[in-house]
Amino acid sequence: MDKLELVNDGLNIIDFIQKNQKEIQKTYGRSSIQQPSIKDQTKAWEDFLQCTSGESEQVEGGMSKDDGDVERRNLEDLSSTSPTDGTIGKRVSNTRDWAEGSDDIQLDPVVTDVVYHDHGGECTGYGFTSSPERGWSDYTSGANNGNVCLVSDAKMLSYAPEIAVSKEDRETDLVHLENKLSTTGLNPTAVPFTLRNLSDPAKDSPVIAEHYYGLGVKEQNVGPQTSRNVNLDSIKLYTSDDEEADQLEFEDEFAGSSSEVIVGISPEDEEPSSVGGKPNESIGRTIEGQSIRDNLQAKDNKSTDVPGAGPKDSAVKEEPPQKRLPMLAEEFECSGSEDPIIRELLKENSLINCQQGKDAQPPYHWSIERSISPDKTEIVNGAVQTADRQRPGTPMPKSRGIPIKKGAQTRNIHLLGRKTCLGRRVVQPGMFEDHPPTKKARVSMRRMSN
């Protein structure tokens, strides 16, 4: 073939490619590259296995049997001993024919399929009061030996350990099984879940907390009147307008002790009977409906009306002073006396009692200015503030009160307390309508309450 013919063939090939470009790209393009078919893969594996088993026409090294006088290794001339007797001999194939007699790959005949069964009241012959045996049962015999529940969704497990159940355990009743269950951490008094008609609550059984908390206590030790439900009446919400909306505090279920409140009393609403020694019943009354505190009544009787404390101008009448109840040291018995805030409150309480005996006008507000060191707390000389003045730079929050009607009078009890430990609510220093607390005092009291 001369050069001219080669050039013509090349031109013809180029012309053919240009005319059939789309078909060629579909057949030989990059998109057609994929894995070989299963048939090709099977043929390749068969060729490879024949090479490794010595049954092909090609031996090691790639030499053929028809290579002439080249010295090669003849596999048929080797000894035909099996490799199990410790002798190096004939090469044995690593493959095994699947349809060849008894050499099919299968499970070990020693391994049996077992199922774990648990009598949960599903079997007719075994209930809660008879033979609650649990364990593994052998299914190789193909027959039910009477100790197995034929559950449709039973899971067949292989290689599972077989637990031997003695005859005594098979005859054990549930009453004697409680001790064994309690030692393993299970609840022996737990009852199975039963469907109940929610539309008819009268038929519901009483709730027993031990069934849900797993305390291991027998049912007869718990009375039917026992209730572990949270009393919703004891949960109350306390907030203030000067705080963020998301900082809400709740009382816990232990809120059964006393609590102090701030009572809004205007001078003209003072009862004349309170001067004569009759205690004001609205002061010291707890929100939970408890009895009136005796010690608050005794201290309240000391503060009587004074001629010098008459009505003032109209601006003061619009904002009546808030009468502060005395702080009690017993409210801080759980927090410790080393807290600087507690020491300040105790000092303030003692000064209030002394001032009530000396001055003719009862004090309404006290301002405590704390220094950097909490041990060197000093009280400002001009601590007594009038009702028409407030701390500079602090906004006056709106009071949220609950009106309590008694006779013809209506008084607002402002919930300005904050919880401490043991469910007690303590009045913060400066938490009044015209005397809001600073941010530092709020953070300190929040830490003490937590």
Curated annotation (Swiss-Prot):
<keyword id="KW-0922">Interferon antiviral system evasion</keyword>
<dbReference type="GO" id="GO:0052170">
    <property type="term" value="P:symbiont-mediated suppression of host innate immune response"/>
</dbReference>
<comment type="function">
    <text>Prevent the establishment of cellular antiviral state by blocking the interferon-alpha/beta (IFN-alpha/beta). Interacts with host STAT1 protein in the nucleus, blocking it's phosphorylation by IFN-alpha/beta. Also blocks antiviral state induced by Toll-like receptor 3/TLR3 binding to dsRNA.</text>
</comment>
<dbReference type="Pfam" id="PF14313">
    <property type="entry name" value="Soyouz_module"/>
</dbReference>
<keyword id="KW-0597">Phosphoprotein</keyword>
<feature type="region of interest" description="Disordered">
    <location>
        <begin position="265"/>
        <end position="324"/>
    </location>
</feature>
<feature type="modified residue" description="Phosphoserine; by host">
    <location>
        <position position="350"/>
    </location>
</feature>
<feature type="compositionally biased region" description="Basic and acidic residues">
    <location>
        <begin position="63"/>
        <end position="76"/>
    </location>
</feature>
<keyword id="KW-1048">Host nucleus</keyword>
<keyword id="KW-1090">Inhibition of host innate immune response by virus</keyword>
<keyword id="KW-0899">Viral immunoevasion</keyword>
<feature type="region of interest" description="Disordered">
    <location>
        <begin position="53"/>
        <end position="92"/>
    </location>
</feature>
<protein>
    <recommendedName>
        <fullName>Protein W</fullName>
    </recommendedName>
</protein>
<feature type="compositionally biased region" description="Basic residues">
    <location>
        <begin position="438"/>
        <end position="450"/>
    </location>
</feature>
<dbReference type="Pfam" id="PF14320">
    <property type="entry name" value="Paramyxo_PNT"/>
</dbReference>
<keyword id="KW-0945">Host-virus interaction</keyword>
<feature type="short sequence motif" description="Nuclear localization signal">
    <location>
        <begin position="439"/>
        <end position="442"/>
    </location>
</feature>
<dbReference type="InterPro" id="IPR025909">
    <property type="entry name" value="Soyouz_module"/>
</dbReference>
<feature type="region of interest" description="Disordered">
    <location>
        <begin position="429"/>
        <end position="450"/>
    </location>
</feature>
<feature type="region of interest" description="Disordered">
    <location>
        <begin position="384"/>
        <end position="403"/>
    </location>
</feature>
<feature type="modified residue" description="Phosphoserine; by host">
    <location>
        <position position="257"/>
    </location>
</feature>
<comment type="subunit">
    <text>Interacts with host STAT1.</text>
</comment>
<dbReference type="GO" id="GO:1990000">
    <property type="term" value="P:amyloid fibril formation"/>
</dbReference>
<dbReference type="InterPro" id="IPR035430">
    <property type="entry name" value="Paramyxo_PNT"/>
</dbReference>
<dbReference type="GO" id="GO:0042025">
    <property type="term" value="C:host cell nucleus"/>
</dbReference>
